[in-house]
Amino acid sequence: MKISVVYAAPRQPLLFDCRVAEGSSVAEAIEHSGVLRYCPDIDLSKQKVGVYGKFVKLDSPLKEGDRVEIYQRITRVLDEDDDDDD
């Protein structure tokens, strides 16, 4: 079945279209897509994944046409001043 894997890389979003076996999981699709070779900084033990904007687990099964999304980790940066705008 045909699926897509999308990663919002720091410099530019990456899109990988690939074919996987029926019943493949999110993790299998990510591995098969090749995105991990292009972006070795991806850490699936820390980053969340989703399908069409909804968080899913790595073992979730996919359907034809699904778009797997690997989300960037969000970090909060505190400024050093005394205001409450953090």
UniProtKB/Swiss-Prot annotation:
UniProt protein name: Protein RnfH
Source species of the chain: Stutzerimonas stutzeri (Pseudomonas stutzeri)
Pfam families with a match to the protein in the record: Ub-RnfH
Q: Which residues form a coiled coil?
A: none
Protein's gene: rnfH
Gene3D superfamilies from the UniProt entry: RnfH-like
The entry assigns this protein to a family as follows: Belongs to the UPF0125 (RnfH) family.
